[in-house]
Each structure stands twice: as structure tokens, then as C-alpha cells.
Amino acid sequence: MSHSILLPDRALLAISGDERFSFLNTLLSADVSQEVGDARFAALLTPQGKLLADVLCLTEPDRVLVEYPADSEFAKRLRMYKLRAAVALDLLEDWQVTVSFDDTPTAATVRFADPRDSRLGFRIYSPAADSAADTDRTPYDAARLEAVIPARPP
């Protein structure tokens, strides 16, 4: 499969600033301070442990890209927790999340292997105008189910 599949239910947020790692590490279920180019799966939980959002965090040289459920209040919650932290939160509203099972490098803006399971292919973050992605996510959902990766209910 050489095409990409659009995941319209996912959104992107860029977090930059000197305290970006400590800010995220106090809120998320996993340590996201890793090497540039590494991705990590994490979750935002309530104090009681209820799942609010599942996220993928990708470390770039000067920011962390966070992929989260588009219909969640993840970005709003992060703004609420920001207070005096030396971080900037930027919604990447003109970007899209796609997935590809082709390991051939592309001209995509950001591309990395899904850290949860190799069967889930490669995540691609790019400006929405740069892609003609397929909207049939059946192949992705089949791979997700085969890898026993749950999906959020609609």
C-alpha cells in the first residue's frame, strides 16, 4: 500500500519552550523527554485514573508535537494547566494526521513509525493542503485490531 490514510479524528498541538518536557511529564502517563525523532505513546488521565485522551508525542529539536483526539478537550486542559510554565501551546489547525504502511521515505513534513506496534505503519504529519489522503480507514482499522490497539468510542 503506497497511499496514506487520513485520520480526521486526530489533531496536532506543538508545545515549545524551555519547560516543555517537565510540563508534559507532570501531566501525561509516560516520560516524553526522549531523543529528537523518537515518539512515545502516553495518556492524559483524571486524578482518579480515568482516560481523558490518548496521545502520541514526537520530540523535535525545539518542540514536541502531540497528536490527540480531535474531539477531546486535551488542548483546553493543557491551557488550563499551563499557568506559569515557560511553554507555548500552538494548535496546528491547518495540519492533518495520516498513516501509511509503505516504508518508502516521502516528502512528508514529519514521518515516524507508530511507537505502539510496527503493524500500525507510519504516522505522517503534514499541512492539509499537501496531501490527497484516502478517507477509507478500513486497512488502518484492520491493522489496529490485529495489533490489539483499542480505539476511543465515537
Please report, for each region that a protein language model flagged, where it lies by residue.
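Basic, glycine/lysine-rich polyanion-binding surfaces/domains
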Residues: M1-P154
